[in-house]
Every structure is written in structure tokens, then in C-alpha cells.
Amino acid sequence: MATFARMVKGQVRYYSAPLDMAIPASKQKYIPASGTYPKGFSVSGTHVGVKASNTRFPDLALISSETPCSAAAVFTTNKFQAAPVQASKNTLKATQGEGIRSVVINSGCANAVTGKGGLEDAVSMGAKVDECNGLAQPSTLVMSTGVIGQRLPISKILDKIPTAHSTLSSTHDSWLTTARAICTTDTFPKLLSQTFTLPSSPNRTYRLAGMTKGAGMIHPNMATLLGVLCTDAPIASSALQPLLKHAVSRSFNSISVDGDTSTNDTIAILANGAAGGAPITSTSSADYTAMQNVLTSFAQSLSQLVVRDGEGATKFVTVRVQNSPDYESARLIASTIARSPLVKTALYGKDANWGRILCAIGYTQGVAEGTVVPERTSVSFKPVDGSAELKLLVNGEPEQVDEDRAAVILQEEDLEIVVDLGGGEKGEKGLGGEEAIYWFCDFSHEYVTINGDYRT
């Protein structure tokens, strides 16, 4: 098939990154009309033609700082780690997360399972950016996304990197174009930005921006896709890594589209300190706590855009597991529900089949003993309109479900599933108040069609 995009019941799914995406009307609201971007960072999106079928759309993204950055990243746990993952890990290890200047990303080819030659290609991409920055030492992180098992057209990419560097810009349009350049089957670019303050400098404004991509092969086991976060706050790399790890565990590590973990998953953050102020160096400082809250909330909002763009998805579902003795057990239960094909297909079919949710809770592996007790487990649907929860199961006893109300709730795009492991208010029956939240989407006919045609 020679066409660049495939239409699936109104969803245009691109297999490289189009500049003039036919974004579905329902997704237009997620595209920012403006932004507040961190000082000292500039970006570009450039056409290379990584895939032969892409004759004009940007598929090479470059994010660069005028000054050296502290950097941190989290990577996929898939055993078949892609060449760019290996290259970026090596760069961070060699630099100890200091002095990083850029991130370069191509879409259209994952450069995964490509052997020694693939690793050399990834290293050469970073080296070419370093050359453009006038640097001899490795200072660029590399990411790739696309089809696994194919070599990059590396000569074409290396030839275009100087163009990408010469067109770096800090405008909103440039940030949006760059976010578009990393898309594959995404139906819209995923870009957010915000301002914040820190306790030590209450009158100083800091900025945080981030872009991510992903719509399929999304289920975390340390990261879930590609993402780059940039801030002009001063943060030492020793503090940046735990900040990112915490944020990812409660955001990109808490989403699922289809239960698959990619070979290329990488989330990176760069902090250049361009806004000034006292550097965050201690994990026990007030600034660190404030930054942790800002970064985690921001990462949650950014990661949720991936779920909202899940391949073939018609629903955005929050599953909240509460009244657990520990966070990890609650997270495992939420994760199991989120990746259950039976739960996901029931939601697509607008079927209030709570038995499938209960089944997923019951077979969850790795939870602390005594966490799941049928006689104190409750399940309910929580409507987005703020009305009362629809109770499905209370203390292990099924409720007489109002099917008409259930149908109304399930008709909505957004839905929350609440699982209470204590059967009542937090803290009852000797349990703690630990809670975990996961975000996921449903499974539809379109998901099968999209992925059945992925390489065509």
C-alpha cells in the first residue's frame, strides 16, 4: 500500500509524522494554541524521509539548549533494547548526567534489533549533533521510533541534521512542529507547557515543557514510549534522576493502551538552570518536594494524552484502587485491570460487566498477602458529571445494578472505576490508606485493523 495514512472509521493514523495532520475533531481540544517554554531551549522539526513513502512531512526532531544541562532518563526494560536506548544510556553514564546539550529523535524507523551497525548509526546521529554544537565530547541523547528490525537510512539523516540545527527556534509553532515530527500512529501531537515557582525563589518564574508520542505498544515496565521534558530550573543531575523516576512511576508508568512494552521506550528530562536561582541538590529540601509535585503532576497530564490517543480508543478510563495496605499492591491491581482484554472490550461494548473487573483483581500476581479479601472488596463506576457512584459490588456482595444508569455512564468518553479493598472508608478494618491510579483505554475493532496494517 503506497498511501501515507490509513483512514479507520474516521481516525487518520499516520505511519510517520505529518505536519498537516487531519486531526479528528474530538482531539482538537488537546492541541495547545500557545505555550510558555523554558529559557535557553530551541527546537526544530525537519523532513528527512526516513520512510520512503514520506515525501514531505517532518520526521526528525531536535531539542537543544544554549547551555549545558543536567539530564536524567528512564528506559524500557524490554530485553531487546534498541540501539538509541543503548547509545543514550552510554552517554548518560559517561557524562554522569551533566553537560548534555541536545536530544535528537527520528520517527519512521525504530533502529531496534539492528545489531552492531544499528548502534553505530545511533552513535553517529548524536555525534553529528555534537559537531553542529561545536562539541567534541558526547552531549546528545538519541531516540528513535517506528518499525522494528530495519536499519536507518543513516546517510539521509546525517545530511539533514545540520538543517535541523540551523532552523532551531523557540516559537510555539516550532515546538508544535517538533512534537509532530516524533509521531507515528498518533492522531495528534502531544505537547504541554507550564510555569511554576519554588519556595526558595517565590518571585522567580520557572518554565517546564514536554512532548511525547505514543498510541500503541503502550504498557509500562519502566517507561512506555518516547518523551522529552525541558525546564529552565536549576537542578543537579543527582536530584534530577530521582525526581524523574518518581514522576514516571506515577504517570508514564501508570498508563496502558495494549499491554505491550516497546524496545525503544525512553523518557528524558533536561534542566539548564537558565532562569537562575539556587540549584536543587538535596532530595530533602523544600524545593525538591515542590519540584517533585510539579513534575509528577505535569508528567501525569502529558502521559494521559497518550491514552486519549490510544489506537482505536473510544474511552479514557481511570482505575483507582484504594484502601490498600501498600502502594505497590494497589498499583499491581490497577495495572492488571488496565491491561485486561476482557475489561477493555466490555467497556468498548458499554457493558457493565463488573465480573471481569473482579476477575482481574483476583488473579493479580505479586500483591501482599491479605490485600485482596472478597468479603471486604467493593467496586463501583464513578461518573464524570460528579453524580453519585454506581455501586456494583459492596463488601463482596453484588448490588442490584441500575442498567439504564450504567448505560448512561458507559456512554461517556471518560469513566472512572473505583476498587475499594477495605469495603468502606479509608483506614477501616486495619488497612492503610494507600492508593494507586492507572489510566487506560478500551479495545475496539479499529485497534485490530490499525495494527494489522501497521507495516503496509
UniProtKB/Swiss-Prot annotation:
Keywords: Acyltransferase, Amino-acid biosynthesis, Arginine biosynthesis, Autocatalytic cleavage, Mitochondrion, Multifunctional enzyme, Transferase
Reaction equation(s) it catalyzes: N(2)-acetyl-L-ornithine + L-glutamate = N-acetyl-L-glutamate + L-ornithine; L-glutamate + acetyl-CoA = N-acetyl-L-glutamate + CoA + H(+)
Location(s), subcellular: Mitochondrion matrix
Keyword Cytoplasm in annotation: no
Binding site for substrate: 184, 213, 224, 311, 451, 456
Post-translation changes: The alpha and beta chains are autoproteolytically processed from a single precursor protein within the mitochondrion.
Pathway membership, UniProt: Amino-acid biosynthesis; L-arginine biosynthesis; L-ornithine and N-acetyl-L-glutamate from L-glutamate and N(2)-acetyl-L-ornithine (cyclic): step 1/1; Amino-acid biosynthesis; L-arginine biosynthesis; N(2)-acetyl-L-ornithine from L-glutamate: step 1/4
Keyword Methyltransferase part of the UniProt annotation: no
GO terms, biological process: L-arginine biosynthetic process; ornithine biosynthetic process
Residues at the site labelled Involved in the stabilization of negative charge on the oxyanion by the formation of the oxyanion hole: 145-146
Active site: 224 (nucleophile)
GO cellular component, one term: mitochondrial matrix
Misc: This protein may be expected to contain an N-terminal transit peptide but none has been predicted.
Subunit structure: Heterodimer of an alpha and a beta chain.
Family the entry assigns: Belongs to the ArgJ family.
Official protein name in the record: Arginine biosynthesis bifunctional protein ArgJ, mitochondrial
The organism's taxonomic lineage, starting at the top: Eukaryota, Fungi, Dikarya, Ascomycota, Pezizomycotina
